[in-house]
Amino acid sequence: MSELYQHRARKRFGQNFLHDAGVIHRILRAIHAREGQRLLEIGPGQGALTEGLLGSGARLDVIELDQDLIPLLKLKFGLESRFSLHQGDALKFDFASLVESGEKLRVVGNLPYNISTPLIFHLLEHAPVIEDMHFMLQKEVVERLAATPGGGDWGRLSIMVQYHCRVEHLFNVGPGAFNPPPKVDSAIVRLTPFAEPPHPARDPKLLERVVREAFNQRRKTLRNTLKPLLSVEDIEAAEVDPTLRPEQLDLAAFVRLANQLAELPGNR
C-alpha cells in the first residue's frame, strides 16, 4: 500500500495534488454535497476530495486519466457501493451517459491547468444535464471567467461561459496547498448553468463565431474585426457602435450581433 501512495505527480498530466486539510474542508463546504445527489469528480488524483464527497452520502463517479493512479483509487474506495471509477480522458467523455432522464449532475474537479479551458467548453456542451460545477483552476483563468466588460480579462472565455452559466469566484488558494507546489496561485470557481440564458441567442454557434472573430484582433474596432461576418450597417442594425473595440461590449451586445448574423442569407 505504501508503494501506491508514492505516486509522483506527472508534469504531462498537469498534476498538482491537493493536500491542505483546511482548503479541502473549505472546498467541501462550498460544494455541500447531499445524500442522493449524482456527483462527478474529474481528476481525483490521490483522492483528497473523494473521501469527503463520498462521506456526504452522494453517488460519485470519478474520471482519472493517469492509469497508475487507478490501483490507489480502487484500493481506497473500490468497496464503496456509491463509487464508480472511469479510467479515461474527460475531454472525450459523454457526461450525459451518467444520468437518468430528469437527473442532474454536479461536477467537481481540481482541473489540470493545461486542459482547463477546453474541458470547460466540453462541459458546456452538456450544460442541460449539469446542476453546477466547482473547479480548482489557475487564479488567472478564474479571473477571466468572472471578468466584466472593459477590462483586459474580458474575452471569449468570459463571454461564452457567462452566456451559459452564473460565475462565482469563491476564494483563492496558494501554491503551498499542493504537492508539488504550482508556480501560480489557484482559485475555486462555481459555475451554475442557467435554465434559460438571460440573453438567448438564436444560434449559440453563431455567437461563438462572432466572439471569436471579434477577439482575434481585440485592439481593432468592430468595423474591422467583424468585417468577414458583418457590414457596418449590420453592426448598427444590432444597435452596436462599430467604432467600439470588442472588450467594450457586454454579453447582450454580442448576442444582438449574433442574432443579426443569423438574419443574413445563408445563416437562417
Swiss-Prot record:
GO terms for molecular function: 16S rRNA (adenine(1518)-N(6)/adenine(1519)-N(6))-dimethyltransferase activity; RNA binding; rRNA (adenine-N6,N6-)-dimethyltransferase activity. Its EC number is 2.1.1.182. It catalyses: adenosine(1518)/adenosine(1519) in 16S rRNA + 4 S-adenosyl-L-methionine = N(6)-dimethyladenosine(1518)/N(6)-dimethyladenosine(1519) in 16S rRNA + 4 S-adenosyl-L-homocysteine + 4 H(+). GO terms for cellular component: cytosol. Its main location: cytoplasm. S-adenosyl-L-methionine binds at residues 16, 18, 43, 64, 89, 110. The keyword Nucleotide-binding does not apply. Gene3D superfamilies: Ribosomal RNA adenine dimethylase-like, domain 2, Vaccinia Virus protein VP39. It comes from the Bacteria. It holds the Pfam family RrnaAD. GO terms for biological process: rRNA methylation. Specifically dimethylates two adjacent adenosines (A1518 and A1519) in the loop of a conserved hairpin near the 3'-end of 16S rRNA in the 30S particle. May play a critical role in biogenesis of 30S subunits. Belongs to the class I-like SAM-binding methyltransferase superfamily. rRNA adenine N(6)-methyltransferase family. RsmA subfamily. NCBIfam families: ksgA. This is Ribosomal RNA small subunit methyltransferase A. It comes from Pseudomonas aeruginosa (strain ATCC 15692 / DSM 22644 / CIP 104116 / JCM 14847 / LMG 12228 / 1C / PRS 101 / PAO1). The gene is rsmA.
